[in-house]
Amino acid sequence: MSEFLHRLYRQGWHADPAVRPVGRLMIAAMVVSCLYALASVALAKSLADFQMHRQGMDDGSLPASAKAIVYGAYSLRVITVVSLIFGYSYLVQRLSRRSPSEHRLLLSWSIFGVAAYSYLIFTPNLPWTHVVQAIQMVILLAVAVLLFTPRVRAYFAGASVD
């Protein structure tokens, strides 16, 4: 695990100077996403209660066993943490591959992320979740903007970047 984290740090935080800001922002997005997923696990009961109340299921008719299943389902978000770590590390590794297809992959991923978090901000949920989603959206928007800069585009095109 330490080798994995060391490689992620080396490939993202200390990437080529042309894409170093992108790597650092992607690592920041990964950390925020993981903290959000862990907080969701820790606060699974309050999140589940909020959603059940919002959907009208919290009128006392729901048996305790059904509520336990809902709480358990929210607790499974720990799987999200693992998938986020591996997903972001996969994308950070793409920074070292200088090809237009890698640039398109990173660009489409960041634009999709901005769109997804923009949608999630307007869905009913607890206020703290919207704050975290807004932070994630801003980070991914910054990644997308950086990927459009001439220096980063030249890097992925294989040209020399000063």
Segments from the language model and where they lie:
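Cytosolic juxtamembrane helix and N-cap/initiation of the first transmembrane helix
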Residues: 1-47, 162
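Residues within membrane-spanning alpha-helices of integral membrane proteins
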Residues: 19-33, 74, 78-81, 85, ...
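Hydrophobic transmembrane helix segments
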Residues: 29-74
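Transmembrane-helix signature of multi-pass solute transporters
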Residues: 35, 115-119, 142
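Hydrophobic, membrane-facing alpha-helical anchors
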Residues: 57-62, 79-90
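Juxtamembrane helix-break-helix junctions at the cytosolic face
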Residues: 85-104
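Hydrophobic alpha-helical transmembrane segments of integral membrane proteins
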Residues: 100-137
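Membrane-water interface at the C-terminal end of transmembrane alpha helices
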Residues: 139-162
